[in-house]
């Protein structure tokens, strides 16, 4: 499967922002495939983005054969764009998901990027060794607990900046007060006549 173009695509909603109030609407979501369960003629795909997870249901009779076949080939961490109709779940509500009372019935599926099997599961409270998580930091940052930490840090930093700006402070970044970069970049010297 080749990666498909994003030309003409625009996300209308984030996965975790969907709710029963959007039932009947056509939406476009983009995200990573978290799980793919193929029940033969019925494929359940959980799609995750930074806001949460939504279930997409590819069903024989509702989706054409090519779409069903494409969905069956999806693997963990593939990046996809899906356009479909939001519907109330016909089966049991999933209490573990904020979007557990709805699902998307797809009209189109685009695979934006394929992925090899990740070295560890992208899930909360992963039991993976820290050494492996740090080696694949770009994957580790997709985990829900780290996403929460990043959002909290961003929120605190924004509030702090707003407070000090409101008090008339000016934010200044100077080379002498900045952090050093341990990735091999050399610190640059600033000539000074003081020393």
Residue ranges with predicted function:
Residues 1-195:
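Class II aminoacyl-tRNA synthetase catalytic cores and aaRS-like
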